[in-house]
Amino acid sequence: MNSWTFQADTLNLDYLQSDEFVKKSAELRGSVMMIGPLLARFGRAVITKPGGDQIGRRRLDTHFLGFQKLGAKFRQVEGRDVYEITAQPSPTTHHPSPTTLKGTYMLLDEASVTGTANIVMAAVLAKGTTTIYNAACEPYLQQLCKMLNRMGARISGIASNLLTIEGVSELHGTEHTILPDMIEVGSFIGMAALVGTGVRIKDVSIDNLGIIPDVFRRMGIKVKEEGDDLFIPQQRHYEIQSFMDGTIMTLADAPWPGLTPDLLSVLITVATQARGSVLFHQKMFESRLFFVDKLIDMGAQIILCDPHRAVVVGHDRKRQLRGGRMSSPDIRAGIALLIAAMSARGTSRIDNIQQIDRGYENIEGRLNALGARITRITAP
């Protein structure tokens, strides 16, 4: 188990203005998550347009509107594509805190996971009470709130869409064990179902997987819960269920506790070898289904109805996908294509694998240990 210790007694805030910081933060969408903690502690943060997956519009309005509700101000730095966010008292005003953030009521325009988390991290040190309605309540958010409470924060309503935060003057250190990545768990369930001869996924924190195991069961996949492990036996055949009225099964993404959109790509790949048909409805992003063209090139029977919907007609393992060369457009499509390649006849080559690396650590090492034959090729 990897353990890390963090201590940040002194930070170089001038680094936020450097070209190096701007360049690095523009390459990583997660850089936006520094705004909340920096505002809470120092009353100042800098942000440029962050990078990340190209899966459609992924606006940051929820973050910024929340910070503005707390009293932060935004200013574009002249001559640079950079915004400075401040919540600092005037130098001529005696203020006991380094920030002027004040608690308030806010109704989020969407239940954004990262938006809620960012606002929570700012609000815990704001003066007064902050109420966040339509808050995200994914396990990721729950564990953040629980960790902050152990650090001295006062957050109630955890696991609901209504969070109440009583601001405190300071936080202290704590120990925290990070939850298993439920998207990685779901990806391995799909992989084991399609190509495995019996795979055990250990220490998955079953209570925090929500409906993920049941969605695979609706696809006809046998998923056994054994303690805190999941065992996926070899699936010689698996049949997609129909609705009770006999109509075609529809699987659609939704905010938690609904089906996470991050698993639709894997589920689509798994469906290509199922018995029966299923309609996938990707509601939350408009470009995430375009990768199915690559599965079609491999021999999958998929009808792309529009940017949000695709019908998969399974082969029932009667026709194997064929290998080919493809490129990973984003993290989740990348792992789905890797799963498809593992099940395909012949050799496949996947380019742009840094997308997969962003979400799956040492993926080829772990899969090769299970019997896969994956070779990483370093480009000249």
Region roles according to the model:
Residues 1-380:
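Short, structured segments at the rim of ligand-binding sites
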